[in-house]
A protein has these predicted regions:
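Small-residue hinge/turn detector
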Residues: 119-131
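Intrinsically disordered, low-complexity polyampholyte segments enriched for Lys and acidic residues
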Residues: 22-24, 32-34, 53, 179
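Glycosyltransferase-associated regions of secretory-pathway enzymes
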Residues: 51-118, 136-317
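Tryptophan (W) side chains
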Residues: 14, 28-30, 35, 40, ...
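Intrinsically disordered, low-complexity segments enriched in serine/threonine/proline/glycine
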Residues: 12, 18-19
């Protein structure tokens, strides 16, 4: 069964047209006022086409700005090597990616908002080469060959804006620049795997290329990706979904950490942990420091009491 999305559909059509006549049989029939095409391919051709649509064994990550990789990022990359042996790991930075490729990327780079540069870069690289992508704060804890073998994938997270609004951290929501109202978001940074030429990525690239300027308050890659997937049929339900040729996995697969509390809930499905370093947020703001302090207190005294005290304080502030 082929994933029906623009990229794979077009590749399949060209694949059929390029094959010698003796290696395929094409039958047309007229049924209920519509033409239907039945194509028979030899088993070797099916195998070849499947191989062309497999996710390559490459792990991509982005690191713009020229600073050395922090220790936490190095540990995460080491976990990729441990649980995904045999994969080539490629870093993308100023030396091998054009940061002037479009106005959005150029202005984000000039503003030193490197996480937003990587939002575009990951899609361009994956559309061209295919493979896996992880943010540098993603720790892999189990082998995920079964997920890669199942085809193109992304994963859900609970919207950071929704979580912060539940806390009452309105100032942090504004500083973050993400849009509210999404109980679930599809976050490409958690883990993203695709074969080359996926149509969904082409649409995302076109979206970014059409933006005349970069502005943090316009939204994040989670907002843009989720909105596009909704146009393709994504529903607001926490379950595994197939949308636009991509499997969207539930939160527990790639995002077991609660970004509000820092609590990690592992299940048998969990293959990685996103540690939410949030490099795109100003870590010097009072609201962010308060958010981190609350997480540490939850770790010491438990979520129930700290959240209760937090709600009481908010009512009297």
């Amino acid at each position: 069964v082929l994933p029906i999305c623009r990229g794979s559909y077009i590749r399949f059509c060209w694949f059929i047209l390029a094959m010698p006549l003796e290696m395929k049989l094409i039958h047309w029939c007229w049924y209920e006022k519509k033409w239907y095409c039945y194509i028979w391919l030899s088993p070797c051709l099916w195998l070849l086409f499947i191989m062309l649509n497999m996710i390559p064994k490459i792990i991509h990550y982005c690191w713009f700005g020229g600073n050395p990789l922090p220790e936490d990022a190095q540990k995460c990359i080491a976990s990729w090597k441990k649980y995904l042996p045999g994969y080539e790991i490629k870093e993308w930075n100023e030396s091998n990616f054009d940061v002037n490729c479009c106005p959005y990327v150029r202005e984000a780079y000039q503003a030193k908002k490197y996480a937003f540069v990587s939002d575009y870069a990951r899609f361009e690289v994956l559309y061209r080469e295919g493979g896996l992508y992880f943010d540098t704060d993603v720790e892999v804890i189990r082998n995920m060959d079964h997920i890669v073998a199942a085809g193109n994938f992304m994963a859900f997270e609970k919207s950071l804006a929704t979580k912060l609004q539940e806390e009452g951290s309105v100032s942090t929501v504004k500083a973050v620049g993400v849009k509210s109202g999404l109980a679930l978001g599809v976050a490409p940074g958690l883990g993203l795997g695709v074969a080359p030429g996926l149509g969904l990525l082409h649409e995302l690239l076109e979206f970014y290329q059409a933006k005349e300027h970069f502005a943090v308050e316009d939204g994040t890659v989670v907002d843009y990706t989720t909105a596009l997937l909704r146009k393709h049929g994504l529903v607001e339900e926490h379950r595994l979904q197939q949308v636009a040729g991509v499997t969207i996995y539930p939160v527990d697969y790639f995002c077991p950490m609660d970004s509000t509390t820092g609590i990690i809930t592992l299940t048998d499905n969990t293959v990685s942990i996103h540690h939410y370093s949030c490099s795109w947020i100003d870590h010097n703001t009072f609201s962010w420091r308060l958010h981190i302090l609350k997480n540490k207190l939850i770790g010491l005294f438990g979520e129930k009491w700290i959240m209760k005290i937090s709600r009481i304080l908010k009512r009297h502030m």
